[in-house]
Each structure stands twice: as structure tokens, then as C-alpha cells.
Amino acid sequence: MATQVEPLLPGGATLLQAEEHGGLVRKKPPPAPEGKGEPGPNDVRGGEPDGSARRPRPPCAKPHKEGTGQQERESPRPLQLPGAEGPAISDGEEGGGEPGAGGGAAGAAGAGRRDFVEAPPPKVNPWTKNALPPVLTTVNGQSPPEHSAPAKVVRAAVPKQRKGSKVGDFGDAINWPTPGEIAHKSVQPQSHKPQPTRKLPPKKDMKEQEKGEGSDSKESPKTKSDESGEEKNGDEDCQRGGQKKKGNKHKWVPLQIDMKPEVPREKLASRPTRPPEPRHIPANRGEIKGSESATYVPVAPPTPAWQPEIKPEPAWHDQDETSSVKSDGAGGARASFRGRGRGRGRGRGRGRGGTRTHFDYQFGYRKFDGVEGPRTPKYMNNITYYFDNVSSTELYSVDQELLKDYIKRQIEYYFSVDNLERDFFLRRKMDADGFLPITLIASFHRVQALTTDISLIFAALKDSKVVEIVDEKVRRREEPEKWPLPPIVDYSQTDFSQLLNCPEFVPRQHYQKETESAPGSPRAVTPVPTKTEEVSNLKTLPKGLSASLPDLDSENWIEVKKRPRPSPARPKKSEESRFSHLTSLPQQLPSQQLMSKDQDEQEELDFLFDEEMEQMDGRKNTFTAWSDEESDYEIDDRDVNKILIVTQTPHYMRRHPGGDRTGNHTSRAKMSAELAKVINDGLFYYEQDLWAEKFEPEYSQIKQEVENFKKVNMISREQFDTLTPEPPVDPNQEVPPGPPRFQQVPTDALANKLFGAPEPSTIARSLPTTVPESPNYRNTRTPRTPRTPQLKDSSQTSRFYPVVKEGRTLDAKMPRKRKTRHSSNPPLESHVGWVMDSREHRPRTASISSSPSEGTPTVGSYGCTPQSLPKFQHPSHELLKENGFTQHVYHKYRRRCLNERKRLGIGQSQEMNTLFRFWSFFLRDHFNKKMYEEFKQLALEDAKEGYRYGLECLFRYYSYGLEKKFRLDIFKDFQEETVKDYEAGQLYGLEKFWAFLKYSKAKNLDIDPKLQEYLGKFRRLEDFRVDPPMGEEGNHKRHSVVAGGGGGEGRKRCPSQSSSRPAAMISQPPTPPTGQPVREDAKWTSQHSNTQTLGK
């Protein structure tokens, strides 16, 4: 029947699916696009709006024009009316009824749509028109079953012929541009993949692609005749699968290329793409494919990865059309070096490059010709060029104004303050007015790198505000005379004109050669006038000096040279005794031996000259001030870590770990001045013992040297003078060089142990200067420590700060100073001392390597737990032990105080008050910036909460510390805090500032005008005392309030804590600063003694 002819479509998909033999289900047919593939004149639709006239035609009779353009074939697409878009399905066709009947049934069922289920009217059959004309005639004779035999033969060869024909199509150079267009068109069918595979628009587009390729092999499967419904359905599945594979392959190629166009291009930079090889200019896939490289010559070469914006998009797709579908994956990277195979899938093709990374260009720069050429200079901008006779402006086109600015800034830097403070070479080249030759500046390498033109340098510096040019010389405009330095004196070149008067210059052996003197009496030699050329040349010599040798040893020559002082390192010896020793040698020695001995003596002097220079450097300290302005009274952070705090353990901590709740504080012993001095000396000796342990290896070395010297034989004084001659005298030196005393050995006891007896012996006096004369590192009574040598007397730096003032009964009627100690609830002050350990105790850090510094282990464990003082040889040890003194490492004691302050609250920690007191005393003699900043911060924080003991300790440090060592920055802080304290209603800071101005030796101080106004109200020290307020009782305890404000707090202080605020602050607020300060704040008790008004 005619209905069984139509099931196979050219696109490999069917519109009619057989449910049973002769029964067809018609699917949704979209409207057919118009264009190149429109049907021919025999088409069923033919542009007629009514499909009823064409009912005799089969449903699949839509003609389709093939790629060659001269043949037509009908597509099995059903006819439908224009604009009809609903699905037309016919279920009831059986056996292929008559044409008219079938069309009527379809029209009734379709509701406006035509379902062509009639038998085929095969007037023009596109399936057999082109390939097999006999089949076409058979179809025209309306005997469709005869088409099955030739169709089977052609269908069997379809897959092989398509594969072969596609390879042949790619090899056709004439039709090459057509696949590129097809690749762009094939993106549209890709979007229809999720839709049902039996829709016609994707299939028609695929037919147009096949038609554009001109493959005649696609027509061969369409020449098949339909056998039966089952056979044609099987044929449909086979061709549909083949068309899907082919269609998917066409869709795959452009999609992959568009998404990953640059991944393989970055890896194609290999040695064949170097600039000197123009035959590899087209570095594209044509090189890798190798077979059609001729077609890629006009294509622009791809740019490297670092120039993606110059990539030609159209040429990119054309290049990749010849590559394999999946060779742009991993295989493209591997076969990029020399591979020329197809590289299908993820293989590496036939290339031998493998995973070749470009060792020639480690950064992946692939090409340096074409557009990359102008970019190459940017990789050499960091190179500094030095020119001989060529200016940089001749090599590079630099703006002249910009170049002048560079030159000006470079030379202005040379004359800047920061550079001149370090550039001693430049300052030594300056003349007295600070000028430097412009040629010297132009000879510097950095200036030469800019220009070698002197005139350009003049032009650049013409408008400079830092330097000025005068007569081809340049100097700094501001204070040019302060920078020149005197040039270094070169002592290597001897001025022989100054040596004419030196005895070493006179050829003594010449005189002795002509003078026959007696061997035993050199002074009695009768001088013989010399008449040689050597003597005649010495016309400038004094008369006596050129006459005879004895005149060389006369005292008159020494007086002329004005060098009567010998080196202090040895006993004084006159020049006469020295030269008499030289002339007392046996006279029978030849003159050559005397000459060689003079040369040996000179070499000996030269050998000792380095040692004398070291001694001379040490001697300079004796000509300068003993105290250094910068380092005096200062201590660095490393020495702070060596401090051991010696303080009393509170009585309540010793007996009651939970705290003393009785209020009976009698643990502090009354400290007299004599007892304090004994303890202070004891701490000195304890410190001496700590350092003696450190220097023990040094003592052993000295003892070994002494033992070695004891093995030396005794010699006479003359022989010793011969072995150790005097150093040469420099005539240009105004101050004679001389070594200072050598470092002294620690103690007398150690000296007795090393040298055997305390009194100096003759052998000790005859030792060289490398052995100390006096076995004392420190003085006998006051040992010196690492910081005390900077002071004139180490005994001035006290080690113990006792509390010597006794508390007295408060008198409510007597005026008093504004001080917490005079309040009704004074703080309990404690004795505190310190020693400097020989090794550093670093604070605990997160680093494992931050262990305590090297050295011998100190006695005891310096943990947070107080440790008793170890035994040392001094009576004060028992005193310290009986009074409960313990030692702590400074940073651990500080941490414990801060923890207690945090735990108990501000102003409630007795240990914190002790730390405040230690800071106030210690910083006066050993200033440390970090310690001072912490002291100030914590004291101000306590004062804000109403606890003023720390602030009072700070003011005491200001007053006494600045009086001992004035520091401008500390003085500014003193003024600032004094103004704040007075404006808060307090008088203690102003009193300490008034005392500093009265007793300090500093003059011409710049004082704040506001502070001067406040000081004008107080003429004497008694003016700072205030009367207690009415109704205040001496034994009445007050609650603390914040300084400067009224209103008390309900917090009650522990009896042992310091009062941050004076008592009786609740009754009335402080008087404003502008008023009379006498009635400001009556919270102070009476002053117990006039002698202690400025006390601590």
C-alpha cells in the first residue's frame, strides 16, 4: 500500500511511526523554512494555501533540494495549511485506504489541520530521482513495494561512505570556507537538543548542512524503497542513529572551540615559533595538523596568552575547523611541540613533546615578532645604564623637563639633611664654605645614569630651593658652613721636614764609624767634625745636633721639642738614660750591626704601635666629661630584665595567706638611717657576689697568665728597657698618647688568691702592661655594677629605698599638705630595694627559644613565689632575712602586681603601691622610657578612680628626677600633669613643681603661662597647706570619691591599701582653681614636721 512507503526521512528521523502494519501515527510538523532547500516545482505544497488540492500526494512528499543544486528530492514532511501549528494526528488509517477517503477522515479529525494518510501519489519521488532512476519510474508507476530491493543495497553502504566522504570533504581545498559557515549555523541546532528528537526544524537544518557540504552520499540512503512498516521502522532507527552521530559531531566542533579557544594556544609556544624562523609564523593548528598547512598561510598568527585582546576571532574558528573534534583537550597540550596527528579524544597525537613546559621561555612568552616587538623594552626598565660618552637622552627619548627634575631631585638628595648626617665622604670633600665642585657631583654614578652634560646639570639646579651654584660649585642653601668636615690626616706619608730634629733621623752609626771612642766611656768621646756630604746636607739642624753624637742625648733637644712627658704606662725614663743605654753597648760591634739594631728597634716600635693606639683610644676618656649626656642615668631594656626586686613580704601574706583581717599592721620594722645604710651595703655585696660568679672564668684565665709569667727569668732594668722601648712620639699630636689603667680584678680577696699576697711585688711591677697593676674591678667598699660605671660615684645609686618617716597621730585642727599619707586612711608603704643580676631574665614568651640568657645559673628560683635571699658575706643578710625580705625577678614581680591590681581593683593592691614607690625612686638614677610610660599610664588610671598614691609617686619622680637629670620631654609632661592636677582641685602636683623650680639648677625654663599664673598664688611652702573642713574628725574614715568631683562611692578600702583620694571629700566638692586653694579640699591631716615638707 502507498502508506507504507513514507516512514523514512532524509534526516534520519521519522514523522510516521507504525503502531501496526499499515497504521501510522503522525507527529507534530513545524512549518518548513523557506530558502535554499525549498521544494521544486513538483512539490506538493507549491505555495498553494489550500492543501486539499494536493491530497493525492503522499504525506512525505515534500521535495528537498540537495547540495548540488540540480536535483530534488522529496522530504517525508506532511503538508499542512499555512499558519496551522497544532498537532495533526490520525489514528485510524488501516491498510492505506483510498486517497479521497483518507484525506476526508484526516480533515475531520484534525479540526482545521490536514492529515494526509492517503496512498502516495509518487509523481516525483526525491528518494529515487537522483541516485536510481529505475526506482523513480517504479514509484511513478505507483508500485511502491518494488523500491525495497535497491534501497537495501544503498543503505548498507551508508555509514562507511559518509565517513569516507567527510574526510574527503575536509581535504577539498575548494569547498573549505563552506564548513566554517556550517559550523556557525550548527550552533542553532545545538540549542534544540533537549527538545524531542523527532521535531523537524533541527532535521531540516541538518539537511541544509549536508546540502552545503555537497555530499552525494546522503542521497543514497534516501533512494531506498519502503518494504513494510517494520522494515522501514528499523531502517529509520539505523539512519537516525547515524545521523545523530554525524550531527552531534558537527555540533561539537564549534562549541568546544568557542568555549576553549586559548587553553591550547598558551601551550603551543615551542622552539619552532622563535622569531628567527619565519617558516613557523602561522603558529596555529595548521602546523599541528600538517596536511593542509597551505590553506592557513593568510590566517593571522595567534597572539600569546598575555595579549589576548589581539586575537583574531574569525581566523580562530577557521583554524580549528581542520582539527579533530576533541584534540583541543589535554591532547592538544601534549602534542603541541611537534605533534602532527589528529589527536582524537584526549590522546597526545603523534607529537613527541609530551607535557613539555617551555624551558626556553619560563614565563610562557611565545612569540616576539609582529605585534610583540614594540613591547619588549618594558622588560628592561629596571636596568641601570652607565655611559662613558653617551648621554641617556641620546638612547631614550626623555622629556627634557622631566629629566631636569630627576637631576635636581637626585642632587638635592645629596645635600639633604638626612644624607649629610651620614655621608662623611661628601662632607670631607667640602671646602670651608660648604662648596663642592660640580664635576664631583657629575661624576657620581646615579647622576651619570641621568646625564653627562654639565650644562644640563646647571640648568636643572638653577631653580632649586635646596642647593645653590656659585662659580661652578654647588652647596646647600641653608647653613652650608655647618657641614664641612676636616679631611682625614694620612699618617702613612711621613713629612721628613719634621723629622730632622728627631734623634732617629740622625745617622748615629755614621758618627760612631768616624769617632774612635773608648768602649767604656761613651760620654767622654772627643767629637770629630764630620766633613761628609751627609753632614753638609743637614744645614737646618741645630749646631749641637750636627756636631757629635753626645749632643743628641742632651736635655736641650728635649726642651726644644717640648715633649718631657713619657707614656704613663711605665715608670718615667728620661731620654738620656735611654740613649746612654744604647751607647753603653759594646763598641766593637760593626756599624752594620748597629744599623740593623736601629732598624729592629724601629720595627719593634711599629709592632707596638697598634697596642698603643688602643691604649690611646682608652686614654681619650680621661679628657672628656665623666658623665655622658645621652647615656647617663639611663638603662636599657635588657638590663631591666636583670633587675631583682628585694622587698618585704607583707605580714598578712606570711602568716595569713588569705589576708590579714585584724587591721594590726606592725610587720614593718622601724628603719633608722644607720640600719638602712647597712642593708644598702649588703645589697651591694650581694650584687658583687652575683657578678663574681660570672667573672670566675676570667679570673681563672688571669691566674693562668700570672702562673706563666712566674716562669720568666729575672732581668735587669736595662734589659727590660731594651725589650720594651718607648713608643714613637708624633710631633703633630698635642696630647700625648697613653693607655689608661687596665680593667681591675674584682676583689682584694681574689687578688690575694691569684697573686699570693696583697702587697705588690717586684715581679708584678716588672710585668708587661697587659697585666693589671691593681687587682680591683670595683672599689673596696662600693662594688660597681654594669650601670654604675657611668656615674661619678657608684655609691650615689642607692640599692635600698627605706621608709624612714613615721606615722603620727592625726590632728584635725592643724593645716596639712595635700597628700595621701597625711589623710585619715594613709596607704601602707613598704621598704623596697633592688640588685642587678649578672644575667638577663627574659619575660616568658610564646617562643620556645626565648629561654633565660646564657650564664651561670643564679641562686634560687626566680619565680612568682617570693624567695629568700641567698647567703652572702655581710651582716645585713641576717637583717634582711629577719625582716622578711625576699627577692623577685622584676618582670615577674611587675606581672604579679598587675594581676593583683586587676583582681582586687584599682587602688586596693598593696603590692602595686610598692611597685609605684620603686618606680619613683629607680627612674631617678636609671631612666628607662618603657618603664616610665607604664608608670605614668597606671598612675593616671588610678587617679581617675580616686586613688592618688601612684600619681603622687609620679610627681615625686618629676620633681626629684628632673632635679638630678633634666630631660625636656619629661619636663613637658610634668607641666601638663601639674596643670591637670591643679584644675582637678589638687595641690600636690603644683607643690612639687614649685619645689622643683626653687631647688633645681636648671635656668631659663619655658614654663606654661597658665602654670605661671597658678604658681603666682603661692609664695612659700606653707601656702600649700590647707585647713581641714569644719566638723571633720581625725579618726573618721571616709569613703573615696573620684578626684575633682563630689559624691562618694560605697566601696570601702582595705586597711592596707593606699588612699587614692584624701578623706573627707564627701562633705564639699573642691574649690574651683580660680578661687583660693586654701579651702579647696579638706581631706588632709596635719603636717608632722616642717623638715619633711618636701619629703617623699
Curated annotation (Swiss-Prot):
Family annotation (SMART domains): DM15, LA
Domain of life where this protein originates: Eukaryota
Sites of the Glycyl lysine isopeptide (Lys-Gly) (interchain with G-Cter in SUMO2) crosslink: 260, 311, 531, 703
Gene Ontology CC terms: cytoplasm; cytoplasmic stress granule; cytosol; membrane
Gene3D superfamilies per record: Winged helix-like DNA-binding domain superfamily/Winged helix DNA-binding domain (1.10.10.10)
Keywords: Acetylation, Cytoplasm, Isopeptide bond, Methylation, Phosphoprotein, Protein biosynthesis, Repressor, RNA-binding, Translation regulation, Ubl conjugation
Modified residues (Phosphoserine): 75, 90, 143, 165, 215, 220, 225, 228, 324, 327, 517, 521, 548, 591, 627, 631, 766, 774, 824, 847, 851, 853, 861, 868, 1040, 1058, 1089
Phosphotyrosine modifications at: 777
Entry PTM: Phosphorylated on multiple Ser and Thr residues in response to active mTORC1. Phosphorylation is important for interaction with RPTOR and the mTORC1 complex. Phosphorylation promotes dissociation from the 5'UTR of mRNA molecules with a 5'TOP motif.
Basic and acidic residues composition-biased segments: 63-76, 202-239, 259-290, 310-320, 805-814
Outcome (variant: residue 766 to A): Loss of phosphorylation by MTOR. Decreased interaction with RPTOR and impaired dissociation from the 5'UTR of mRNA molecules
Region Interaction with mRNA: start-end pairs: 873-1023
Coiled-coil annotated spans: none
Region named Required for interaction with RPTOR and for repression of mRNAs with a 5'TOP motif: 574-1096
Effect after changing residue 966 to A: No effect on interaction with RPTOR
Comp. bias intervals (Basic residues): 242-252, 337-355
Chain positions found as Omega-N-methylarginine: 240
Biased composition (Gly residues): 97-110
GO biological process terms, semicolon-separated: cell population proliferation; cellular response to rapamycin; mRNA stabilization; negative regulation of translation; negative regulation of translational initiation; positive regulation of macroautophagy; positive regulation of translation; positive regulation of translational initiation
Annotated phenotype, changing residue 999 to A: Strongly decreased RNA binding
Function recorded in the entry: RNA-binding protein that regulates the translation of specific target mRNA species downstream of the mTORC1 complex, in function of growth signals and nutrient availability. Interacts on the one hand with the 3' poly-A tails that are present in all mRNA molecules, and on the other hand with the 7-methylguanosine cap structure of mRNAs containing a 5' terminal oligopyrimidine (5'TOP) motif, which is present in mRNAs encoding ribosomal proteins and several components of the translation machinery.
Record-stated family: Belongs to the LARP family.
Protein name: La-related protein 1
